[in-house]
């Protein structure tokens, strides 16, 4: 086992990365190795998808499957070895379909790619796990050096984050053949084990550039299905009655669940990255969508254990449900999986509803605590003139974008301290589950109107923040980096990595990121990123605030 993709990975004097019987996330060595094998098979699939496109051959099923299966290897998504092995087998089935299609144009087609002809040594999990060891992601690290290896992983993990957003868009009927072509190009290239540092950095930015279009596509899918988010108050305290908790990112699953539970006397609560759902008109109209429960994903074992109903995980982040003894009432959907947990293949939530009715539910209604969400792209852009007026009047000095992933490191209290210590003439635009560090605090308003805390949505709604910045830049006639706007990113896994690469690809400078640097990037690479893009790690809220204001003075 070698896995170094998330913030919680092992860091020791002997080296970084989880490399024993189990990762810090709870993933077994077997599952981790099988994920490496799956990635190798996906490299092969993409290599042939690139070749097939030379003849105008597009296999839509393969195009959809590839990023979806890659998503399964994201942190805290799928811990089920059998399903990972199944994805590897399916990847080669699609690969072989592409080879057959190319054979209509070439007799005995070949491909100059190290993984073009990879085959699996059987079908059993045990056999595949043994084979998988040769595809560990650190096999050539000593040969190519820490810097090149780290930036290659930056590309791989960034592309993994983009693949997740591609899958989120696809379930909302949004896809683009040009984006699929770019994805396959990057995935095929990564399978050749590239080691030129300059090329790797260029590709990292190109992956970020592609992801901007993916996020735009996802934004279109969400707004076309559910309407443009509008500011809305959300109760974060329990309401008496039977209940279901839904977590993850898949708003379509939530819509289906709301339809199927309507009139059944069951209250539905959002959790984690589902919180922004309360701002979408086509979701908030359901009266039994009563509120949000819990906090960041890392607290789920305690919070899910005391939630008296059924739970649905639609995407990341899932951790071991056996710890809190709720494995019998949690259900996985889509690409998510945990051994022994009931997986729902389709949108039939009958088992979830039955379980919710069996459970006790909340015995009484607690006193309301309301927070505000719903500051999506359209709302933010519509407010751009008001923001400019406040800036010109000297009432709004700076906007801080504080968002990204949450996690359980003590150092993450930095984000709470920073947000709460900011001057009253500043605003905080937040997105992703990092918001749970401060979104229940009262930040008040600026000049009695603009809320100082603006929740723009899920991590992929970085697109909304970017479009606000672009709009302000155009209206003020200044560059993006001249705006009184700064980004303090909270990273944990691969979605945050691709968000960072997207920002860098757009030319955004001086991003602050933490609470610690990725374990796969050494100090030399971090120094290079600081030199090229102004990327900085975190120190203290006071010191970083001083640097930010000093640069924008």
Curated annotation (Swiss-Prot):
It catalyses: A + NH4(+) + H2O = hydroxylamine + AH2 + H(+). Hybrid [4Fe-2O-2S] cluster binds at residues 249, 273, 317, 405, 433, 459, 493, 495. GO terms for cellular component: cytoplasm. Binds 1 [2Fe-2S] cluster. Binds 1 hybrid [4Fe-2O-2S] cluster. [2Fe-2S] cluster binds at residues 3, 6, 18, 25. Signal peptide: none annotated. Its cofactor is [2Fe-2S] cluster; hybrid [4Fe-2O-2S] cluster. One of its GO terms (molecular function) is metal ion binding. Keywords: 2Fe-2S, Cytoplasm, Iron, Iron-sulfur, Metal-binding, Oxidoreductase. Pfam families: Prismane. It is found in: Cytoplasm. The modification Cysteine persulfide is found at residue 405. Gene3D superfamilies: 1.20.1270.20, 3.40.50.2030. Its EC number is 1.7.99.1. GO terms for biological process: response to hydrogen peroxide. It is an enzyme of class 1 (oxidoreductase). The keyword Disulfide bond does not apply. Catalyzes the reduction of hydroxylamine to form NH(3) and H(2)O. Belongs to the HCP family. NCBIfam families: hybrid_clust (TIGR01703), PRK05290.1 (NF003658). This is Hydroxylamine reductase. It comes from Actinobacillus succinogenes (strain ATCC 55618 / DSM 22257 / CCUG 43843 / 130Z). The gene is hcp.
């Amino acid at each position: 086992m070698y896995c170094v993709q998330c913030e919680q990975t092992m860091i020791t004097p002997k080296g970084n990365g989880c490399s024993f019987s189990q990762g810090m996330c709870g993933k077994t060595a077997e599952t981790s190795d099988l994920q490496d094998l799956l990635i190798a098979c996906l490299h092969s699939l993409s290599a042939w998808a690139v070749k097939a496109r030379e003849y105008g051959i597009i296999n839509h099923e393969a195009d959809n499957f590839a990023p979806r299966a890659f998503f399964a290897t994201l942190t805290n998504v799928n811990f089920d070895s059998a399903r990972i092995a199944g994805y590897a087998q399916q990847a080669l089935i699609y690969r072989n379909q592409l080879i057959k299609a190319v054979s209509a144009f070439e007799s005995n087609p070949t491909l100059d790619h190290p993984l073009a002809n990879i085959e699996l040594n059987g079908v059993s999990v045990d056999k595949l796990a043994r084979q998988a060891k040769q595809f560990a992601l650190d096999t050539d690290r000593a040969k190519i050096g820490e810097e090149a290896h780290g930036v290659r992983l930056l590309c791989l993990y960034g592309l993994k984050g983009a693949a997740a957003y591609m899958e989120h868009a696809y379930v909302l009927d949004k896809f683009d053949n040009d984006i699929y072509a770019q994805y396959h190009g990057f995935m095929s290239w990564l399978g050749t084990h590239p080691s030129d540092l300059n090329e790797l950095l260029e590709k990292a930015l190109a992956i970020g550039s592609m992801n901007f279009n993916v996020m735009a596509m996802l934004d279109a899918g969400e707004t076309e299905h559910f309407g443009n988010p509008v500011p809305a108050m959300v109760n974060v305290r329990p309401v008496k009655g039977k209940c279901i908790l839904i977590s993850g990112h898949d708003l379509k699953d939530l819509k289906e669940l709301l339809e199927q539970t309507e009139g059944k006397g069951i209250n539905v609560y959002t959790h984690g990255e589902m919180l922004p759902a309360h701002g979408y008109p086509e979701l908030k109209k359901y009266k039994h969508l009563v509120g949000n429960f819990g906090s960041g994903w890392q607290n789920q074992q305690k919070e899910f254990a005391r939630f008296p109903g059924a739970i649905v995980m639609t995407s990341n982040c899932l951790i071991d449900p056996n710890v809190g003894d709720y494995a019998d009432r949690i259900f996985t959907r889509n690409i998510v999986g945990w051994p022994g947990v009931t997986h729902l293949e389709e949108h039939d939530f009958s088992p979830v509803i039955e379980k919710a009715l069996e459970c006790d539910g909340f015995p009484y209604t607690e006193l309301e605590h309301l927070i505000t969400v719903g500051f999506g792209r359209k709302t933010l852009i519509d407010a751009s003139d008001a923001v400019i007026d406040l800036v010109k009047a000297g009432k709004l000095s700076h906007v801080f974008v504080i968002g990204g992933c949450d996690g359980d490191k003590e150092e993450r209290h930095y984000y709470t301290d920073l947000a709460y210590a900011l001057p009253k003439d500043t605003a905080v635009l937040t997105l992703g589950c990092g918001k749970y560090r401060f979104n229940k605090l009262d930040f008040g308003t600026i000049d009695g109107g603009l809320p100082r805390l603006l929740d723009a949505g899920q991590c992929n709604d970085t697109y909304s923040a970017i479009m606000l910045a672009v709009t302000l830049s155009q209206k003020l006639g200044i560059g993006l980096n001249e705006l009184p706007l700064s980004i303090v990113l909270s990273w944990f896994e691969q979605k945050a990595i691709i968000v960072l690469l997207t920002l860098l690809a757009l030319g955004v400078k001086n991003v602050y990121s933490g609470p610690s640097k990725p374990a796969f990037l050494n100090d030399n690479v971090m120094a290079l990123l600081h030199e090229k893009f102004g990327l900085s790690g975190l120190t203290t809220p006071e010191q970083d605030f001083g640097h930010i204001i000093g640069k924008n003075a």
